[in-house]
A protein has these predicted regions:
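C-terminal catalytic histidine-bearing segment of alpha/beta-hydrolase fold enzymes
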Residues: 213, 217-271
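N-terminal cap/lid segment of alpha/beta-hydrolase-fold proteins
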Residues: 1-34, 164
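Mobile cap/lid helix-loop segments that gate and shape the active-site cleft of serine hydrolases
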Residues: 154-188, 194
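Alpha/beta-hydrolase active-site loop
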Residues: 80-102, 254-255
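Conserved alpha/beta-hydrolase "acid-adjacent" motif
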Residues: 205-214
Length: 271
């Protein structure tokens, strides 16, 4: 295992923690080092902070499943507007693809995972990667489309079911304005949106389940493959649903295994 941090090429004010399979000091082809898919984790926090509970506790599950894993520590608060977190995520996936050979990563099997506002960030990459408004702000022509998305109780809509604080932070606009509404991601889904895994709880009063339901409806209309699980119990922010993150929901914790099995199917990957 090799663990290190980097700042993606062409961006600033963020860092990425990388967990790579292979020799601790260098990676070389061997019986235990071969090309693998990758997962980029975007913790939540309302675009006001970055949750530790949705970072390493999540990443280690995908690493254990054989994925090269990355955690993005993106900009929040006043720095969350002007597409900065999304430019940071786009730069991260471009950086991973640029180093794919060196890191034994399969460049067309890179997924993004996000929780709550981090789910909005991950989903933004999957739905806005080809939007002229974002591309103008990004100013680069890198391959930034993720190959799959895993969205956990994500912030999606900018309507009556929106998590207003998240959308205000990322849009830099007041509730109900056109700029605010533009960040309703279900309105940007099209046939190029990547395959998506969604899960939410019916009891979530912070980010209502309608966010995932509307995303699923949009994916279905665009004929994008997806899998969705609505679990009956559990409030917002339960992460991997175990004692490590202080939300031990053994029933709900199954989402982790489900998402890995789904990704393995989409990526045709077996360890």
């Amino acid at each position: 295992m090799k663990v290190f941090e980097f700042v993606p090429e062409g961006i600033q004010d963020c860092r990425v923690t990388a967990w790579l399979h292979g020799n601790e000091e260098f990676l070389e082809m061997s019986a235990y080092t071969y090309q693998r898919p990758a997962m980029i984790v975007c913790p939540g926090g309302g675009y006001g902070m970055v949750s530790q509970r949705e970072a390493e506790p999540v990443a280690k599950h995908y690493f254990a499943a054989g994925y090269n894993t990355f955690i993005l520590w993106y900009s929040v608060g006043e720095m969350a507007k002007d597409f900065l977190p999304l430019r940071q995520l786009a730069s991260t996936i471009a950086h991973v693809r640029n180093h794919a050979e060196e890191w034994y990563t399969i460049k067309d099997k890179i997924a993004v995972s996000g929780f709550s506002a981090g789910g909005h960030l991950a989903c933004s990459l999957g739905t806005l990667f080809n939007e002229e408004r974002f591309l103008k702000a990004f100013g680069r022509d890198d391959d930034i489309r993720p190959n799959a998305m895993v969205l956990s109780y994500p912030v999606i809509t900018a309507d009556e079911f929106a998590h207003q604080g998240s959308i205000c932070n990322v849009s830099g606009s007041e509730v109900g304005t056109e700029d605010y509404k533009w960040f309703g991601l279900n309105e940007h889904v099209d046939a190029q949106t990547p395959p998506t895994f969604l899960w939410h709880t019916a009891e979530d009063t912070c980010v209502p389940v309608e966010n995932s339901l509307k995303m699923a409806t949009a994916l279905s209309a665009a004929k994008v493959t997806f899998e969705m699980h609505i679990l009956p119990e559990g409030q917002h922010g339960i992460s991997v649903c175990n004692r490590e993150v202080n939300t031990p929901f053994s029933y709900n914790s199954r989402w982790v295994e489900w998402s890995i099995k789904w990704l393995n199917k989409v990526f045709e990957f077996e360890v």
